[in-house]
């Protein structure tokens, strides 16, 4: 009897120790995330301190990048990053929405799995493959056919004459934005497909029963029900586009001058760092570190805005 009681107390103590160890371990893992973010932020701040102390906040809008004279500014990479990322979103979001509608509402059962698998495979392709594909396929195609046609069609229109003008190099912001769009389509489409499938069938069946078309059901029933998930998927794609390096480096042109049109060669923050960091030293290396810090802050701001937008949508839905 005494031995059985002692054994029970020992088992209870062992369970308590295991539970305590489990709780502390998971707590450490959670804290480790914040420590990792703090470490990245600290290293970027210390690495960019020389550049910040030399140029101050003028680094943000200065458009010169001259290693010989040690004069650096971030506005050109910032503009290139934002233009290519938002251009990619403009192209990718409608296509992703169409793919998600097809997979959830229109595709026959035998076709849904192969198409879904193909989307997942596209998401798994390394970015350097997209970059090589863009350089050897898109660039000649754009240079010889697409860009000359766009210049001919839109060159005389008031607004489009600025967007589609200049020499048809093939490489440039437009090509980089298109390659980025192809890269982020699988991510956005997969998220939209998943959130569309959680809509209760009775809502869609009721709408169809009232005579609604597929477009009306998606626009007035499915999309309002899944707004939060759709916004999250779009922001996931934007975050992917902002930080993309290799694919953009292949096709953007890597030129440090402000773009005159969408066809102009330019550069992005990630491309500038990838091209120059290995050979940089002194103030140039510090300027590249500050570019990295700016990219870190941009992605943080985008993530924060997306979270606030999602919270606002959820709060508004809660009032209904």
From Swiss-Prot:
Keyword vocabulary terms for this entry: Cell inner membrane, Cell membrane, Membrane, Phosphate transport, Transmembrane, Transmembrane helix, Transport
One GO-annotated biological process of the protein: phosphate ion transport
Cytoplasmic side of membrane: 1-27, 104-114, 192-229, 311-320
Membrane side Periplasmic: residue ranges: 51-80, 138-168, 253-287
Span of domain ABC transmembrane type-1: 78-306
Transmembrane residue ranges: 28-50, 81-103, 115-137, 169-191, 230-252, 288-310
Compartment(s) where it occurs, according to its Swiss-Prot or TrEMBL record: Cell inner membrane
Similarity section: Belongs to the binding-protein-dependent transport system permease family. CysTW subfamily.
Protein name (record): Phosphate transport system permease protein PstC
Record gene name: pstC
